[in-house]
Amino acid sequence: MVMTDPIADLLTRIRNANMVRHEKLEVPASKIKREIAEILKREGFIRDVEYVEDSKQGIIRMFLKYGQNNERVITGLKRISKPGLRVYAKSNEVPRVLNGLGIAIISTSQGVLSDKEARAKQAGGEVLAYVW
């Protein structure tokens, strides 16, 4: 079966694993999923990311992060730009998530960036998701 929205699938897998407090999850690899996983690691939402090469497309293994009392670090994920309705932001209109407590993931001409990085590089683009 062909997947119509692999980014939404990635976010749903992270959300589901997080809700049942799994330590790790594996998703089929793609370039954009790899970049999103790196942003989540860099911003402190997940502990680590590994890339496993297999005979097909490869696997991204993500290790989720939890607080001292096993509380979730990721409290919410939301897909913004969808295949049926694309959402774009200009460089001066890059959204803030929960007044800076969360991040927006934006696909720009300079690669996939967090909202903070996009503001620093003055880059706009497609708003892929919010994570808080």
UniProtKB/Swiss-Prot annotation:
Gene: rpsH
Organism: Bacillus pumilus (strain SAFR-032)
Keyword tags: Ribonucleoprotein, Ribosomal protein, RNA-binding, rRNA-binding
GO cellular component, as recorded: ribonucleoprotein complex; ribosome
GO BP, one annotated term: translation
Gene Ontology molecular function: any one: rRNA binding
Subunit structure of this chain's protein: Part of the 30S ribosomal subunit. Contacts proteins S5 and S12.
Function: One of the primary rRNA binding proteins, it binds directly to 16S rRNA central domain where it helps coordinate assembly of the platform of the 30S subunit.
Pfam family, one: Ribosomal_S8
InterPro entries given in the database record: Ribosomal_uS8, Ribosomal_uS8_CS, Ribosomal_uS8_sf
UniProt xrefs under SUPFAM superfamilies: Ribosomal protein S8 (SSF56047)
Name recorded for this polypeptide: Small ribosomal subunit protein uS8
Domain of life: Bacteria
Family the UniProt entry places it in: Belongs to the universal ribosomal protein uS8 family.
